[in-house]
Amino acid sequence: MSGYFITFEGGEGVGKTTQIFLLAQHLYGKGYDVLTTREPGGTAGAEVIRHILLSGQVQQHYGPLIEAILFTAARIDHVSEVIMPSLQKGKVVLCDRFIDSTRVYQGLNDKVSSSTLAVLECLALNKIKPQITFLLDIPARCSMKRANLRREKAETIDYFEKDELKIQEQRRQAFLQLAKQEPHRFRVIDGTDTVEVIAQQIRDICDQVMLDQLP
């Protein structure tokens, strides 16, 4: 497969969307064909599922397993209809959240067993995996402040942003643990730095890693 797959992970309000936009502009300037996308979402069908999931109705009425299954359904559609075809065409795909968010959000405290999540992941991935995952890491208190500010500005309404500080910190630690388990894929970025400092770090990493792998 001739393309390159980069994902962005982290808690709420860490700045993933901003950094994806800035990296896309950088890569466009270098002549790469870039696709930006997100999860849950990325296709018409997956966006419908996104709306349901972020409303919190599934978690409240059906529980974490059904929630994980719906995330997987959205991912299957997203991978088969958008990510895989784009990679086959040689595009650089930048995705806001992917498998690691499912591992953290649905797997935290064994809400859904790791074995079940592994099966769902296998169904969805079609053998693809990100070459680089940027983990934007900020303290949970900072994450909650940013998420609250975003809600006040009516930029988004997200069920997961409403979770208490303890849960947010547990998710942060779970992401960091994943990064320790797969250091070849993860790049942990201090999300408390300025937007430009973070963007430059990400650009430098991509330029170095992708130099010998893409034309």
UniProtKB/Swiss-Prot annotation:
Belongs to the thymidylate kinase family. Keywords: ATP-binding, Kinase, Nucleotide biosynthesis, Nucleotide-binding, Transferase. GO terms for biological process: dTDP biosynthetic process; dTTP biosynthetic process; dUDP biosynthetic process. This is Thymidylate kinase. The keyword Nucleotide-binding applies. It catalyses: dTMP + ATP = dTDP + ADP. One of its GO terms (cellular component) is cytosol. The keyword Kinase applies. Its EC number is 2.7.4.9. Phosphorylation of dTMP to form dTDP in both de novo and salvage pathways of dTTP synthesis. CDD domains: TMPK. ATP binds at G10, G11, E12, G13, V14, G15, K16, T17. One of its GO terms (molecular function) is dTMP kinase activity. It holds the Pfam family Thymidylate_kin.
